[in-house]
Structure formats: structure tokens, C-alpha cells
């Protein structure tokens, strides 16, 4: 039953049944004995030691004084002025309607 199932699967995969039967009939080749290879030479890499940074107190690390604070802050504007700063009104004053001459 297993051979029939194997043949059906092989036929479905596109293999010829004769090639599959020949493949299954042959006994697997014995594994070749492996010779022990010489171990690879290991190279040792030396680490480069970096210079230690200067030690600081913990508070000095946390509270850096910004040089930007010394600069003058930009002038504050209202929100609407920020939005419409670049817009100019291009409307011309409305002309009075032409009145018919009576």
C-alpha cells in the first residue's frame, strides 16, 4: 500500500514511476569515513582600550546650562498673526455701481 501511495505521489510530482522505482530499489551508499582535519589556527584579537572620560558629579551631568537661554527670545505674536503673517489682501475697494443717466 505504501509503494502505491509513493508511486501516486511521485506521478503527481511529475516524476516517472520507473525512475522512482529504480531510485527506491537501490540501497543507499555507505557513508564514507571522514578523516580528522587539522584544527584551524585561532587568532587572538587585542582590544583597544579607550581613555576614560573625566568624571563629573551626577548633578553636573543633569543640569547643563544652555547657552540658548542667554540669547534674546523672539518676540511673541498672537496666533492669528502667526498664521496670516505672509498674506496680504489684494482686494480693491468696491466701485460704486454705474447709475444710468436719466
UniProtKB/Swiss-Prot annotation:
Keyword Signal set for record: yes
Biased composition (Basic residues): 80-90
Compositionally biased intervals (Low complexity): 22-41, 91-102
Compartment(s) where it occurs, according to its Swiss-Prot or TrEMBL record: Periplasm
A Pfam short name: Asr
Family recorded in the similarity comment: Belongs to the Asr family.
Protein name: Acid shock protein
Organism, as annotated: Escherichia coli (strain 55989 / EAEC)
Gene expressing this chain: asr
Amino acid at each position: 500500500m505504501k509503494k502505491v501511495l509513493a508511486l501516486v505521489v511521485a506521478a503527481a510530482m511529475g516524476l516517472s514511476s520507473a525512475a522512482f522505482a529504480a531510485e527506491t530499489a537501490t540501497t543507499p551508499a555507505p557513508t564514507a569515513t571522514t578523516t580528522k582535519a587539522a584544527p584551524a589556527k585561532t587568532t587572538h584579537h587585542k582590544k583597544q582600550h579607550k581613555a576614560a572620560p573625566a568624571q563629573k558629579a551626577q548633578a553636573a551631568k543633569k543640569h547643563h546650562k544652555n547657552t540658548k537661554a542667554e540669547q534674546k527670545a523672539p518676540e511673541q505674536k498672537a496666533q492669528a498673526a502667526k498664521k496670516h503673517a505672509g498674506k496680504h489682501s489684494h482686494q480693491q475697494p468696491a466701485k460704486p455701481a454705474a447709475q444710468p443717466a436719466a
